[in-house]
Amino acid sequence: MFNMKKSLLLLFFLGTISLSLCEEERDADEDDGVEMTEEEVKRSLLDTFKNLAVNAAKSAGVSVLNALSCKISRTC
């Protein structure tokens, strides 16, 4: 359980850094100063949440598989 919490925290941290880098890049790309529409804001938020959920699910799956393989091979 502790390993899963650590990996989820790590993924959240990396996702936050990735998100901030993407926002900086997006700000650098905007040269005319046009604001984002509501649709673009919703799309970017949904993509961010989707990516975080997918990464969390992958991490949880890897943690479960590691725990199972450890118990099966009795190397814990």
Curated annotation (Swiss-Prot):
Family annotation (InterPro entries): Antimicrobial_frog_2, Frog_antimicrobial_propeptide
Main location: secreted
Secretion signal span: 1-22
A GO biological-process term: defense response to Gram-negative bacterium
Keywords: Amphibian defense peptide, Antibiotic, Antimicrobial, Cleavage on pair of basic residues, Disulfide bond, Secreted, Signal
Protein name in the entry: Brevinin-2ISa
Function statement: Has antimicrobial activity against Gram-negative bacterium E.coli ATCC 8739 (MIC=50 ug), against Gram positive bacteria S.aureus ATCC 6538 (MIC=12.5 ug), methicillin-resistant S.aureus ATCC 43300 (MIC=100 ug) and B.subtilis ATCC 6633 (MIC=12.5 ug). Has no activity against fungus C.albicans ATCC 90028.
One GO cellular component term: extracellular region
Disulfide bonds: 70-76
Residue ranges of the propeptide: 23-41
Tissues with expression: Expressed by the skin glands.
Subcellular localization(s) per the UniProt record: Secreted
Pfam family, one: FSAP_sig_propep
Domain of life according to the entry: Eukaryota
